[in-house]
């Protein structure tokens, strides 16, 4: 029996604002898009400091990747601040203070808890509360199905509604887990 050849469609597209399924997080998405737009135009944004938090699978790393991919030199992006060592926390605190005097720069920090519940240096927690704070909400069933089908289409796969429904009923319901399943399907 001949071995089945696998088709390599390549890696999935990198995270960007256009392939982020916002669901109830539209305000956060629009605000971060506008931030990048303002910075790229050389404008001083009305708000320069942001803290975005949410549970695993809510889209934090996707948005952090989209901000990084925007290649905006005046934008500092920090993901998983909740995992920072004390030394990295101090460095971030000092960097935050330095950015205060740079009106054409912005900082977006992502974590898994609201600022007041983070186990970080108190002075850093205080700074994270200064700007806009967004709580990312997990996608509801319809938005999760849309995100799953969109991610599959980007890989050249057509799941169909029946398979999407099956996956949502019988697997973990976060995008990271669902994308891992899509990776497996893509390799078949």
Language model features with spans:
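Dynamic helix-loop-helix/coil hinge segments at AAA+ ATPase domain boundaries and subdomain interfaces
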Residues: 7-29, 166
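Phosphate-binding P-loop
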Residues: 23, 34-47
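Walker A/P-loop nucleotide-binding motif
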Residues: 44-62
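Conserved P-loop NTPase "ATPase switch" module shared by AAA+ and STAND
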Residues: 72-98, 106-113
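Short regulatory helix/loop adjacent to the ATP-binding pocket of P-loop NTPases
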Residues: 115-129
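Conserved AAA+ ATPase "SRH/arginine-finger" region at the nucleotide-binding site
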Residues: 131-143
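Conserved small helical "lid"/interfacial subdomain of P-loop NTPases
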Residues: 140-160
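C-terminal helical "lid" of AAA+/P-loop NTPase domains
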Residues: 165-169, 176-188
């Amino acid at each position: 029996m001949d071995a089945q050849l696998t088709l390599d469609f390549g890696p999935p597209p990198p995270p960007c604002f256009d392939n982020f399924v916002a669901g109830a997080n539209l305000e956060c998405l629009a605000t971060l898009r506008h931030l990048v737009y303002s910075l790229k135009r050389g404008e001083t944004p009305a708000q320069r400091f942001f803290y975005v938090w949410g549970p695993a699978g809510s889209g934090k790393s996707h948005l952090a990747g989209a901000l990084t991919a925007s290649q905006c030199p005046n934008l500092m992006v920090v993901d998983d601040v909740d995992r920072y060592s004390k030394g990295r926390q101090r460095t971030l605190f000092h960097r935050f203070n330095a950015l205060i005097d740079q009106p054409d720069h912005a900082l977006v920090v992502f974590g898994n808890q609201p600022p007041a519940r983070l186990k970080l240096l108190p002075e850093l927690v205080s700074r994270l509360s200064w700007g806009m704070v967004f709580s990312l909400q997990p996608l509801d069933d319809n938005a999760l199905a849309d995100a799953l089908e969109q991610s599959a289409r980007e890989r050249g796969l057509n799941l169909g509604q029946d398979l999407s429904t099956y996956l949502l009923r019988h697997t973990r319901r976060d995008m990271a887990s669902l994308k891992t399943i899509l990776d497996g399907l893509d390799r078949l």
